[in-house]
Amino acid sequence: MKESEAKQYRRHEDAYPEQRTAADTFQIRRATTRDADIIAWHRARMFQDMGDVSGDAFEMLRANARSRLEQWIDKAHYIGWFATPATEPEMIVAGAGVQLQPILPRPLDVSTIGEGQQGTIVNVFTEPQWRRRGIAGLLIKEIITWSKNEQIDRLVLHASDEGRSIYERLGFTESNEMRFVGVS
């Protein structure tokens, strides 16, 4: 029996089960083109939760995202991951992805030049009943590991108020990035 499996059977002196971590109770798998619909659903739900989309715009966002995701996953412009309960591997409870863009050479530090790609973390979403269990952090750690292995020069993201503390704990910092929102 693995140590992680044994943990679930141990009990504290007060007879409560020992706390299990997200890594013990969830599995992570890569998304495929066949998963474009669930990724699009997560994306639309994420914006809905933030109050940025509702009604007909929800379905339009979902349909447009699905179409683009099918193309981008196939061409490896988008890499996604899902979390599933270890006991129910077909039940997707959370997801996250990286949108890849080539970038011009830039200094990574005073003596190293990066010439690869930038990854923008997007679509971080956990179904409401599964939140506050460490799943989003588990997905972001997977993305960080993958990005290091793939020599992605830089990871960026746009944090929601709810997600900011997760990203800060994992080493993300605020930057000087600004955004032009255009004229109405």
Give the location of each predicted region.
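A short beta-loop-alpha structural element at the N-terminal edge
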Residues: 27-41, 52
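A short helix-loop-beta-strand connector motif used in the catalytic cores of GNAT acetyltransferases and
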Residues: 67-82, 101-104, 120
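Conserved beta-strand-loop-alpha-helix junction that forms the acyl-donor binding cleft
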Residues: 131, 155-166, 180-184
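Conserved GNAT acetyl-CoA-binding A-motif
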Residues: 140, 147-159
